[in-house]
Structure formats: C-alpha cells, structure tokens
C-alpha cells in the first residue's frame, strides 16, 4: 500500500523526535552522574579550603601582632629617648630640642589613642607624664625669666629723678614671646604665669606708696598742706608703672595686639581697684573732716584724672577710676559751700579790731586758704562743671549776701571757668562783707575808720590775689568784683569827708549890694568854724593811720582831694570878708595851704 508524501514526512519527523528524546535522556543521566561526582568532590575539598582560609587569617593576625610588637618597641624607644631630653630641661638641651621632645611624646600618645592600642597603657601613661613634665619645664623656665625681670622697685626715687621706669631686657622679652607661644600650644587653658608674676611685681612695688596715702585725723584747725598726703605720688607711680607694663607687653608680643590688650587689662585690674579703694577712703575722710581737709579732695581728683587720661590710649577698662572720680566730684560740691562758711565763720571769731586799724589775722588766714584752694584750679574746674550758678551758696541765705554782693545783677553762667571764678569771688565777698558788718558792730560811730580798715584788708586781699593762682581763677569779671568791694570800702572811708564837704554847700545869698544878711553872716561864720574843726580832725585821724602800702596811701589822698574844688569855690566867695571884719579868724587856709595839707596826706 502506497503512502502519501505528507504521511511520509510525519513518520520521519516522529522517528527523529524519538531519537532526540533518547539522546536527551542519555544526557540527563550523564549530567546526574557529573553532579554526583561534583558533590563528592566538594565534600572532599571543602575542609581543605577552609583550612587554607583560616591559615590566611592566622597569617594576617600574626603580621598585625608583629607590627604591634614592633610599634610598642618603637614607642618605648621614643619615650625612653625623649625622657632623657625632657628631664635635662630646656636650659641644658636648648629650647628647640626640648620642644621637639615634647612634641614627640605628644605624638606617641596621639597615635596610641588613634590606633586604640588599649593593651599598652603603661606606654601611653609614660607619654602623657612626659608631655606634662615637659610643659611644666617650659613654665618653670618662663617663671625663671619673669622672676629675673620682676624684682620689686621703689617708684618714688625714679619719679623724683625724672628717669623712665625700668623695662624688661629685649633678650628676655624675645624669650618670653617664644616661650609663651610654645606654652600656649601645649596647654589646653590659658597660662597665667606672665600675668601672675607681673601682678605680684606691681603689687609689691606699689605697696609702700599706697601705705602712705591713708588719711589721718590731724590735731588743730590748720588747713591741709598741699601734697602732704601722697595720693599724687601714688597716682603718678601707678600710671608710670602701668605704662611701662604696656611697653613690656608690646615688646614681648609685637605681633599679637589681642594678647597685649588682654594681658594689660588683666594686669591693670587689681592695681586700679586697690587705688580706687584708697581714694574712696580719702573721700570719706574729707567728708568727715571737711573743715580742715577740704582741699585734699581736689588733690585726689587731680591725681585720678591725670591717671585716667594717661591710661586712655592703653585701655578702655578703667571703670574703677570713673567711679572714684564721680564720687569725688560729689564730695567736692560740698567743699565749695564749706569754703564760704569758713570765710564767714572766721570773721565771727574776731572780737576786736587792730589798734592801728590795719590787717587782721582773719584776713591772712582766709586768704591763705583761698590761695591754697586756687592751686587746685584745674581739678576744681572739673568738679564744678556739673553745678548750677551759686548752687554753692549756704542755705539759709547768709546775712552777708543779704547785705551786699559784688556779683552783677541777674548774672548767671554754665561755663566751668566762670563758675569757679564766681565761687572765689563769693568767698571773698563772704569774708569782706562779714568783716564790714563786724567792724561796724565793734566801731559803730566811726565809718571812716571802718572804711580805712576794710581798704587796708582789701589791699592785702589783692596782694594775695595778684601773687597767686587766684588771679588766674578770678579772671576779668572777678577783678571787676574786687573793684566793687574797693568802692564800697571807699564810700565808708569818705563818709566823714563827705559830711564835712557838705558844709561847703553854700546856701547864702549875696544881695545886689554885694553883702550878706546878718543871718547869713552868722551862718558862714559857723560853717567855717565847724569845717575847720572837722577838717583838722579828719586830717589828724588820717595821719594816725598806719599805711604801709604806697598805692593805698596815694589812693586815699587822691580820693579825699575831691574836697579841694569845693573849698576853693567857698573860699573865693567869702574871702572878701563881707561876713566878718576879722576874716583870718574864720578862714584858716588859703587855697594853696589847703591843697598842701591834702597833698601831704599822700607823701
């Protein structure tokens, strides 16, 4: 039976598939055999591979251990080597080698920490100890240099000589600069060796000066003598020493302005606080003893202000001085008032006037105080700058001011110089007017003598003014106020002369025939008699005055000469003799004689 072509192809394909299946089965069986063989090989080989890996780990660990051992051996060698150097000290081995040794042991410690080699604590401890020992050695070396430069000094002879205060040697300054920089690198905290050493130097040098400013209560009522306390020396010594310290810092740290500023602030703090405490003690003392030690407060202000101004270019940390200056200003305001009270009170102690109507002791004492006061004019100007005009006038208003004041009516000012001038003028007013009131009380019926007494004392007052700093303090306006006092004294002195001169004010009338009435004749006679008696009494009294000052003598003679033209006129009117047949009995002086008598008063 014959097959179609398609069937033949199918049959061939089936046969081929059958062969393929048989081949695949054979391959699967072979792969299974290979797999079984591989499994057996793996089981056999795996122990060998694991052992190899463990051997590699062992090898690595062993190498690491050997490296550690080598490292430990190296660290121990380093610390042993550097220990010899560090123990010798920087002076023996030199600073570079010494610093290198410290850096080396610090590096050992750092590496041990970084590698976490906790199994070698002794090596680490040794490195730490050596680093600490090395740093201490540097500080000791630093302290040695500072000690060499910090022997206490006595500032007083240096101030007296005008020489500059001692500075560190440039060589040691360079060493300090280097050492301080190294110590700063090796120290976690700021090292205070420099500040501590120089602070002790300042304290020990200034201590003897500071001990001499302690105020003491003095016996008696004598006023304070300038510079007898010593605060001015203390202030000047402190300034000069701090300026020298700043120069030292600039020399030691020429490129480190921040450190200069920091160290100087620290160095200045304690000395300034100590000075402030001494100043506050003086200020309190003045308040308790203001009648005798009032001027000491201006000496304190003067020294403290100079100290502050001297330190301003170096530091802005002078708060203790600011506080002291302000408290001193507050005390000084009471001193201005006290000066006026002293001037008035001293006059109240006067019981009698001098027999020659001359200068009284009170004038000398008061003007001596005012002269001393003027010596502190600069500090007084500073202190008064915060006051109002005449705030210093005692309350209640004193009697002298209600009687007379030489101050211009309605005057006021806020300028410190003018305020101080007003204080001095008011002080002189207080004394002069109170002296006038006292003189009138003791000698009520003789105004001319009172006037002469006042003018004599004013002459001494002016002498004190012109020969002292008072002249500068008063200025032009103060001198104008003195002139008002002079005019007041002259008016008193001339009262008797003016009363006598009033007799020459003729009220008589000459009739058309050139003659006087009988009543007027008698009046002229009485006037001449009275005038002659009064005039001679005035001249007699004038000649009894002890006038040692030529200028005053000439001034008084000039002032009384106002009567000359009045006498001349009266003389010319009546010399014809109409009022009397015996003219010489009433007219004792012709015009030339009269003028000569007055001229002799000025010779």
UniProtKB/Swiss-Prot annotation:
InterPro entries: Cullin_repeat-like_dom_sf (IPR016159), Exo70 (IPR004140), Exo70_C (IPR046364). One of its GO terms (molecular function) is phosphatidylinositol-4,5-bisphosphate binding. Its main location: other. The keyword Protein transport applies. One of its GO terms (biological process) is protein transport. One of its GO terms (cellular component) is cellular bud neck. It is found in: Bud; Bud neck. Keywords: Exocytosis, Protein transport, Transport. Involved in the secretory pathway as part of the exocyst complex which tethers secretory vesicles to the sites of exocytosis. Also plays a role in the assembly of the exocyst. Belongs to the EXO70 family. This is Exocyst complex protein EXO70. It comes from Yarrowia lipolytica (strain CLIB 122 / E 150). The gene is EXO70.
């Amino acid at each position: 039976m014959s097959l179609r072509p398609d069937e033949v192809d199918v049959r061939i394909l089936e046969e081929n598939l059958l062969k393929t299946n048989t081949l695949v089965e054979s391959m699967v069986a072979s792969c299974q055999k290979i797999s079984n063989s591989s499994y057996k090989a793996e089981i056999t080989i795996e122990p060998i591979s694991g052992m190899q890996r463990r051997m590699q780990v062992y090898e690595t660990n062993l190498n690491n251990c050997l490296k550690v051992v080598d490292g430990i051996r190296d660290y121990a060698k380093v610390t042993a080597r550097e220990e010899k150097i560090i123990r010798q000290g920087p002076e023996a081995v030199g600073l570079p080698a010494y610093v290198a040794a410290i850096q080396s042991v610090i590096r050992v410690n750092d590496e041990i920490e970084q590698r976490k080699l906790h199994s070698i604590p002794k090596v680490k401890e040794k490195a730490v100890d050596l680093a600490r020992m090395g740093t201490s050695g540097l500080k000791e070396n630093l302290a040695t240099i500072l000690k060499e430069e910090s022997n206490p000094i006595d500032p007083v002879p240096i101030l007296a000589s005008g020489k500059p205060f001692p500075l560190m040697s440039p060589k040691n300054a360079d060493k300090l600069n280097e050492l301080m920089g190294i110590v700063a690198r090796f120290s976690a905290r700021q090292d205070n060796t420099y500040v501590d050493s120089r602070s002790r130097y300042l304290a020990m040098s200034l201590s003897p000066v500071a001990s001499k400013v302690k105020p003491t209560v003095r016996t008696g009522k004598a006023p304070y003598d300038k510079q007898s306390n010593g605060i001015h020396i203390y202030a000047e010594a402190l300034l000069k020493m701090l300026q020298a310290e700043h120069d030292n810092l600039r020399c030691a740290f020429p490129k480190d302005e921040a450190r200069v500023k920091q160290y100087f602030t620290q160095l200045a703090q304690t000395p300034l606080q100590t000075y402030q405490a001494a100043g506050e003690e003086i200020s309190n003392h003045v308040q308790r003893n203001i009648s005798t030690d009032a001027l000491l407060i201006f000496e304190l202000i003067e020294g403290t202000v100079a100290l502050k101004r001297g330190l301003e270019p170096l530091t802005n940390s002078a708060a203790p001085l600011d506080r002291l200056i302000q408290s001193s200003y507050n005390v000084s305001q009471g001193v201005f008032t006290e000066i006026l009270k002293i001037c008035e009170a001293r006059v109240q102690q006067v019981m009698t006037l001098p027999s020659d109507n001359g200068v009284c002791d009170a004038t000398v004492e008061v003007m001596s105080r005012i002269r001393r006061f003027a010596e502190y004019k600069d500090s007084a100007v500073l202190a008064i700058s915060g006051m109002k005009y005449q705030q210093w006038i005692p309350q209640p208003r004193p009697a002298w001011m209600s009687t007379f004041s030489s101050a211009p009516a309605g005057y006021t000012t806020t300028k410190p110089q003018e305020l101080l001038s007003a204080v001095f003028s008011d002080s002189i007013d207080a004394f002069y007017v109170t002296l006038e009131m006292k003189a009138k009380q003791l000698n009520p019926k003789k105004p001319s003598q009172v006037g002469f007494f006042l003018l004599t004392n004013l002459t001494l007052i002016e002498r004190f003014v012109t020969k002292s700093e008072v002249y500068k303090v008063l200025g032009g306006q103060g001198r104008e106020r003195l002139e008002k006092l002079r005019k007041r004294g002259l008016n008193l002195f001339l009262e008797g002369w003016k009363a006598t001169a009033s007799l020459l004010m003729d009220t008589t009338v000459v009739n058309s025939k050139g003659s006087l009435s009988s009543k007027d004749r008698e009046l002229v006679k009485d006037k001449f008699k009275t005038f002659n008696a009064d005039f001679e009494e005035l001249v007699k009294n004038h000649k009894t005055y002890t006038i040692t000052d030529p200028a005053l003598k000439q001034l008084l003679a000039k002032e009384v000469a106002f009567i000359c033209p009045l006498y001349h006129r009266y003389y010319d009117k009546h010399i014809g003799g109409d009022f009397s047949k015996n003219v010489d009995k009433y007219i004792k002086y012709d015009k030339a004689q009269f003028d000569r008598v007055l001229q002799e008063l000025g010779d």
